[in-house]
């Protein structure tokens, strides 16, 4: 405790006694470079103060990127820091939504400060330790054509916004990760060459890499001691000491284990099959074969099917998941033998169809089977099937409906169904080829291996292995030893190895790219929204997305894939959806996925009604009614924002000049202004879709799409809007989650509840959430270590739980 008090005292003394700012911790952006020289759209003007330079940013086409040399010098001071402040003085044009500064690497925003006049918000974007971009939004209007002194101060997980020397907001946020690559770009007054253009004047723009940097603007403000970053650093030091102690304990335990194991050593031979480890003499079933691990070798025998003598009313038939036929109940229908579960369609000349299914040895008619969807193909390309009433188009993918073929068998689409066919190098174990076994070309003499080689059977094929001291001439013959033939190379599994004099070279196979040591599958374009390129030109999409490149969000709402409760409406989100309570209802902070938790709001009891004093509020389901007591002559007036509005009165909202409200018998009805684009006096700020000017159009972030004024779209978990040539984007609104542990699935934007704390993305900074490792050492939340006795198992104290996983790059 005495050490901690001394540590804190030293920190406080250093923070309070400091006078001025050390140039080593100040990034004076307008001192390092002048945007008024060589950059169109920027001019030097008179600022709020006369002793420093101020710059006006105007125009719709400019590219103010800090030169690489100056950017590298500035960013070096910020790299790896978790305590800094962004400070400046500005005067921003009304309704402008622009970026003050942005540090980018590729598509990732490492640090960005922007001010939205359209949404009246200040937004800070930064990268976190989870390699995700976190956005913190402060409802505040800077774009009012007035001078403001702004400071955003970050101290580890503590974020504070100061405006005009007033502390406006104070938040707890994830700790920023300022791992800034050398080739990062630094933009001023814009996000990139085409978006987020700030319009107005900026002065004294600087980043102060020091505790409580806001005091350079407002020296009279109170300072806290120690800062959150000081405390965070102390916790990190304790974690390092814990790790040293754990590593020492691990080495000691390992030494003790080795000493105790010197007397006797027995290594049991095991078998590895499909990433599964089997012990000696352990047996298992693999497809249609019974296998046993014997002395480290897998020995398999084909399952022999016994002859069947099926009783009356049954017939031999395959059952899903079995190798041998079994006696199954059957039905006789139209001279056909059907087994349990099979269907038969009766197509009448009149066009009617009836579907019957064999159940309990009796054919039962299946109701509703004749309700068929419309087909998109010509009638000549429509095929009538025997097991269903609905026709299908020629080329229909039956395999996608039900693939009963095993891993060594391919599903093949036919005109009226699907069948299984063994892959090359395999032969059927069942009559229908649903299960297939590998052909041992070596044992059966069906190989082409020549002298100096040994035939080795492989799944579906064989290979010729050179004898010791020989190298490969081609696939079937050898002459002496080289790296490629012996496997003593570092070529990727999707690369070809070429022997050279004194070495070898690797070249990726067609459809893959890389240096040969590492080869990755190529997909045209790239797999979007969390999709992965599984093989050349094949993207595997995560749930909620579709398309060749996973570029299409599945709108579960419009496609009717979900059914919200009666008092909720479906809201689509990228990769997901949620059910939102309708007007007049709320979930009372008890969230349910389908909106079942939505309950009526009692506007009368909660004081949300607008009834005048001479009427009586009567609650309704999803609303309310203002009723006049019997015998009274009521005015029908409304109470809105503590003001009396007369019955039939119409007014414009003070906070939104684009919304019109009216009083109707005690109830206030508000709506957006009706846009009549034919009216020459229409307000294009309220009706941006009525702005026909080309200068009011916006370019999409990818540079390939053009939007008109008023258009909205979703990009990178943000909802964007084009307004008179300016793009403003803000984070999507996510539904609340009532749980302890959440994660954001890849490709999605909003957190979902998970029961496993190890799957959760967020790591609590609460130091009381500790863990006990395998040595009995207490670990703080967020600390990580290599598990004792392993080299590749990484453990982490996460939300009070020990979570371990194997690092595949370590194996």
UniProtKB/Swiss-Prot annotation:
PROSITE patterns on file: ASX_HYDROXYL, EGF_1, EGF_2, EGF_3, EGF_CA, LAM_G_DOMAIN, VWFC_1, VWFC_2
Domain EGF-like: 395-437, 438-479, 480-520, 521-551, 553-592, 600-635
Superkingdom of origin organism: Eukaryota
Binding site for Ca(2+): 438-439, 441, 457-458, 461, 553-554, 556, 572-573, 576, 600-601, 603, 619-620, 623
Signal peptide location: 1-18
Methyltransferase is among the record's keywords: no
Annotated GO biological process: fertilization
Disulphide linkage map: 399-411, 405-420, 422-436, 442-455, 449-464, 466-478, 484-497, 491-506, 508-519, 523-533, 527-539, 541-550, 557-570, 564-579, 581-598, 604-617, 611-626, 628-634
Main location: secreted
Record keywords: Calcium, Disulfide bond, EGF-like domain, Glycoprotein, Metal-binding, Repeat, Secreted, Signal
Location of the VWFC domain: 269-328, 636-691, 696-754
Gene Ontology molecular function: any one: calcium ion binding
Pfam families to which the protein is assigned, alphabetical: EGF_3, EGF_CA, Laminin_G_2, VWC
Domain Laminin G-like: 54-225
UniProt keyword annotation of Metal-binding present: yes
Subunit description: Homotrimer.
Described function: May regulate neuronal differentiation, polarization and axon guidance.
This protein's name: Protein kinase C-binding protein NELL2a
């Amino acid at each position: 405790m005495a050490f901690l008090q001394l540590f804190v005292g030293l920190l406080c003394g250093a923070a309070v006694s400091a006078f001025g700012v050390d140039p080593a911790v100040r990034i004076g952006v307008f001192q390092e470079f002048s945007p008024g020289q060589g950059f169109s759209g920027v001019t030097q003007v008179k600022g709020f103060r006369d002793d420093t330079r101020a710059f006006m940013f105007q125009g719709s086409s400019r590219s103010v990127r800090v030169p690489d040399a100056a950017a590298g010098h500035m960013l070096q001071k910020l790299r790896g820091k978790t305590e800094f402040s962004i400070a400046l003085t500005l005067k921003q044009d009304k309704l402008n939504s622009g970026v003050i500064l942005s540090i980018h690497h590729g598509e990732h925003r490492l640090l960005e400060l922007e001010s939205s006049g359209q949404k009246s918000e200040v937004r800070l974007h930064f990268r976190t330790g989870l390699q995700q971009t976190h956005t913190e939004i402060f409802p505040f209007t800077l774009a009012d054509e007035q001078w403001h002194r702004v400071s955003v101060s970050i101290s580890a997980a503590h974020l504070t916004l100061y405006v005009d020397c007033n502390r406006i907001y104070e938040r707890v946020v994830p700790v920023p990760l300022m791992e800034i690559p050398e080739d990062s770009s630094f933009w001023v007054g814009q996000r990139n060459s085409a978006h987020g253009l700030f319009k107005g004047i900026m002065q004294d723009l600087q980043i102060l890499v020091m505790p409580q940097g806001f005091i350079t603007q407002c020296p009279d403000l109170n300072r806290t001691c120690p800062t959150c970053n000081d405390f965070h650093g102390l916790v990190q030091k304790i974690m390092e000491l814990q790790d040293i102690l754990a590593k020492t304990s691990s080495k000691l335990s390992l030494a003790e284990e080795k000493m105790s194991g010197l007397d006797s050593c027995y290594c049991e031979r095991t078998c590895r099959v499909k990433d599964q480890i089997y012990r000696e003499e352990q047996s298992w079933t693999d497809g249609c074969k019974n296998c046993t691990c014997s002395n480290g070798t897998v020995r398999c025998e084909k399952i022999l099917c016994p002859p069947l003598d099926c009783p009356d009313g049954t017939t031999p038939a395959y059952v899903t998941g079995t190798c041998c036929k079994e006696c199954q109940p059957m039905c006789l229908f139209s001279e056909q033998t059907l087994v349990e579960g099979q269907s038969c369609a009766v197509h009448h000349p009149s066009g009617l169809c009836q579907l019957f299914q064999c159940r309990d040895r009796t054919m039962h008619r299946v109701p509703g089977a004749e309700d068929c969807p419309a087909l998109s193909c010509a009638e000549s390309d429509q095929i009538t099937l025997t097991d269903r009433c609905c026709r299908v188009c020629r080329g229909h993918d039956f395999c996608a409906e039900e693939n009963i073929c095993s891993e060594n068998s391919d599903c093949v689409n036919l005109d009226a169904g699907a069948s299984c066919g063994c892959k090359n190098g395999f032969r059927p174990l069942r009559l229908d080829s649903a299960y297939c076994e590998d052909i041992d070309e070596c044992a059966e003499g069906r190989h082409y291996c020549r002298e100096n080689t040994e035939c080795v059977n492989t799944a579906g094929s064989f290979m010729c292995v050179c004898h010791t001291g020989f190298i490969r001439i081609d696939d079937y013959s050898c002459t002496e030893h080289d790296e490629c033939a012996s496997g003593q190379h570092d070529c990727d599994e999707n690369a070809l190895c070429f022997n050279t004099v004194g070495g070898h070279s690797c070249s990726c196979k067609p459809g893959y790219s890389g240096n040969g040591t590492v080869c990755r599958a190529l997909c045209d374009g790239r797999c979007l929204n969390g999709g992965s390129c599984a093989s050349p030109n094949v993207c595997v999409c995560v749930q909620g997305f579709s398309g060749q490149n996973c570029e299409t969000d599945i709108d579960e709402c419009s496609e009717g894939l979900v059914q919200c409760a009666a008092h909720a409406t479906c809201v689509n989100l990228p990769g997901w959806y949620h059910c939102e309570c309708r007007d007049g209802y709320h979930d009372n902070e008890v969230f349910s996925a389908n909106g079942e938790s939505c309950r009526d709001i009692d506007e009368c009891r909660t004081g949300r009604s607008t009834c005048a004093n001479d009427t009586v509020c009567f609650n309704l389901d999803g609303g309310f009614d203002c009723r006049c007591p019997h015998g009274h002559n009521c005015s029908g007036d409304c109470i809105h924002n503590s003001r009396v509005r007369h019955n039939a009165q119409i007014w414009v909202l003070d906070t939104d000049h684009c919304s019109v409200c009216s009083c109707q018998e005690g109830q206030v009805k508000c709506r957006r202004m009706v846009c009549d684009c034919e009216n020459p006096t229409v307000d294009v700020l309220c009706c941006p879709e009525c702005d026909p000017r080309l200068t009011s159009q916006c370019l999409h972030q990818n540079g390939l799409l053009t939007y008109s004024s008023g258009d909205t779209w979703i990009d990178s978990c943000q909802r964007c809007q084009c307004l008179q040539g300016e793009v403003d984007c803000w984070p999507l609104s996510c539904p609340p989650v009532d749980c302890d542990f959440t994660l954001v699935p890849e490709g999605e934007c909003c957190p979902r509840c998970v029961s496993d704390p190890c799957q959760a993305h967020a790591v609590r900074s609460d130091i009381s959430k500790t863990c006990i490792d395998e040595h009995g050492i207490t670990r703080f939340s967020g600390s990580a270590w290599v598990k004792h006795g392993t080299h590749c198992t990484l453990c982490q104290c996460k939300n009070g739980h020990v979570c371990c996983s194997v690092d595949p790059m370590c194996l």
